Amino acid sequence: MIKVPIMVATFDAMTRGDLDFHQQLLYRDSLRYGSDDILGAVKDSTEIPLSWLTLLSITMSDNTASLWLQALAGTGTTVNQWLQAHGFDSTRVNSRTPGREENRARYGWGQTTPREIADLLMLIREEKAVSPAASQEMYRHLTRSYWTGEALSQIPPWVQVASKVGAVDHSRSEVALVNAPHGDYVFAVITKEQADTSWDPSNEGWTLIRKVSALLWQHFEPNLPWHPAPGAERFKP
């Protein structure tokens, strides 16, 4: 979920004029991170608009795009400075960030808490992150998630949800801000030191996220009962 703060820092750089949403960037093979990324499949020396990077980072959770954005925004140090300045004391980028090596070894690329990542989505929803215009576009990005198999699977498809998933071997996480018919609600689930490290849909962390999401929908919208249709899991990434 550290890609949300990276997105915010990128839009902050665009608002300051250091970057431009429509600027063309030159992709090089040296930027590739992992074999599963869409951006990593692009040919060397291809021109890519910055707007594609922000979309891929949030919608697909593309690691290559996200690390590139982290560098373009001014490195993890710049992202962390924005977080500190806006009251986020526990959310930090660790990877490729001087002084964060111990945290990187313990937590991975980044770290946050359920409260802080939920607060950050609320800040964007209330158009208070960077600027109203930037917040509006960031919120649109967050409502286009490709990863609909967990929290989103328990919410009707006709309800808009801003969300971001996260997963490493010993943790599964998701934050979601639901624009429900009777009012918004936000929640975040982050597992820690999880014993089940499988990548199957039945993973205990993902199962927990689905259960929490279903319970919250039933709680906040008791007069709008909804369940995934039989066989819906066949069409989940």
Region roles according to the model:
Residues 1-25, 57, 187:
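Active-site SXXK
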Residues 12-32, 76, 131-134:
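Short, well-structured active-site flanking segments
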Residues 29-30, 58-61, 72, 95-96, ...:
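Active-site-proximal beta-strand/loop segments in catalytic clefts of secreted hydrolases
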Residues 46, 54, 67-126:
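Mid-domain, small-residue-enriched loop/turn segments at the edges of structured enzyme/sensor domains
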Residues 72, 76, 119-149, 159, ...:
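Structured C-terminal helix/loop/strand segments within mature extracytoplasmic catalytic/sensor domains
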